A protein has these predicted regions:
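Cleavable N-terminal export/targeting peptides
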Residues: 1-38, 187
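Glycine- and aromatic-enriched membrane insertion/assembly motifs of diderm outer-membrane
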Residues: 34-108, 157-160
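Residues on the lipid-exposed face of transmembrane beta-strands in outer-membrane beta-barrel proteins
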Residues: 45-49, 61-67, 99-103, 118-122, ...
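Extracellular loop and loop/strand-boundary signature of outer-membrane beta-barrel proteins
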Residues: 48-51, 85-89, 130-136, 165-167
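Outer-membrane beta-barrel proteins
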Residues: 54-56, 85-90, 125-129, 171-175
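Mid-chain, well-packed structural core segment of small domains
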Residues: 112-130, 139-143
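Outer-membrane beta-barrel "beta-signal"
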Residues: 173-187
Length: 187
């Protein structure tokens, strides 16, 4: 898939996720006592497109934890993401373990909550080449990311989201457009 086609495809998915969130019925937000403080508040999954520097676009898969708020509207989200793509006979993959900090911008009376944030992650990048082309290599790199998105708390224990993220990783910068869900534990 070429770069223009992958960006158009990713934008179509993002618009679809936002449309789904805008048409879904929102449930009242959980009481603030349930959402305040740090702790294991929920678990979720994500899927989307990643466009790594110097390679074709591919599917990005991930899992995340809602670790709560350390101040009002500021969330901690530990996560793991993985993608793999073949480029010029070389398979490149990235397993990322990281944590994001997202700031919510609640809209009074609105069902959708925009957010922005950033984070740090360890990227375990691996390149596998055929035996005649040097074999392969692996490296661990520290990455910084920025992101923005929209989330919708559809039910007290289920929320959906769509986000755009850019990872700054040496030699493997990545644009990601993802969507997913978070199941919140109510206790």
């Amino acid at each position: 898939m070429n770069r223009n086609g992958s960006v158009v495809g990713a934008l179509i998915v993002a618009v679809g996720l936002v449309s789904l969130g805008a048409t879904a019925h929102a449930a009242p937000a959980p009481a603030s006592t349930n959402s305040q403080g740090l702790g294991f508040r929920g678990l979720g999954a994500r899927i989307g497109f990643v466009d790594p520097e110097g390679a074709s676009s591919t599917v990005d898969l991930g899992l995340h934890i809602d670790a709560g708020e350390f101040v009002q509207h500021v969330h901690i989200v530990p996560l793991v993401e993985y993608w793999k793509v073949g480029a010029s006979g070389v398979d490149v993959s990235d397993l990322m373990l990281g944590s994001d900090v997202n700031v919510d911008f609640p809209v009074e009376g609105g069902r959708l909550t925009p957010y922005a944030g950033g984070g740090l992650g360890l990227h375990f990048v691996k390149a596998d080449a055929p035996p005649g082309f040097g074999g392969g290599a692996s490296d661990t790199k520290l990455g910084l990311n920025i992101q923005g998105g929209i989330k919708n708390q559809m039910m007290p224990n289920l929320g959906i989201f769509g986000e755009v993220k850019y990872n700054f990783v040496s030699d493997v910068n990545q644009l990601k457009i993802t969507g997913g869900f978070t199941y919140n534990f109510i206790y």
